[in-house]
UniProtKB/Swiss-Prot annotation:
SUPFAM superfamilies: Translation proteins SH3-like domain. One of two assembly initiator proteins, it binds directly to the 5'-end of the 23S rRNA, where it nucleates assembly of the 50S subunit. One of its GO terms (molecular function) is rRNA binding. Part of the 50S ribosomal subunit. Coiled coil: none annotated. GO terms for biological process: translation. This is Large ribosomal subunit protein uL24. It holds the Pfam family KOW.
């Protein structure tokens, strides 16, 4: 864990809960699909809004959709198709942890992200 060197679980949890937002971005790494791994030469990337992901665990297992929102505070993502109705009868997105999804297609419109992929690429 990049935030602490302690082996005590309580201190590791505390460092996760109190981590600054620029370090929380590291917690959003998700596995890439095998096709993307071969194409990009990278095993995992941080999830971003606009990526297409497949949910691998939980009630919405197998659901594929675009990432609508990324919540850095709660370390959760919101995916099209993973919805429920709240007590008012409104449809709301269900929060999903990024480690429970697999990225199927990435949004490559950002030049900085392309540089990140080139930097992480295995030779």
């Amino acid at each position: 864990m990049p935030f602490t060197t302690s082996i005590q679980p309580r201190r590791q949890r505390l460092s996760l809960y109190t981590a600054p937002l620029h370090l929380r971005h590291k917690l959003f790494n998700a596995k890439l699909s095998p096709d993307l791994q071969k194409k990009l030469g990278v095993k995992r990337l941080p999830v971003r809004r606009g990526d297409t992901v497949m949910i691998m665990r939980g009630d919405f297992k197998g659901v594929t959709g675009k990432v609508v929102k990324v919540d850095l505070k709660k370390v959760r993502i919101y995916v099209e198709g993973a919805t429920r109705t709240n007590s008012k009868g409104q449809t709301v997105y269900y929060p999903i942890h990024p480690s429970k999804v697999m990225i199927i297609d990435i949004d490559t419109s950002d030049k900085i992200r392309q540089k990140i992929i080139q930097r992480r690429k295995k030779e």
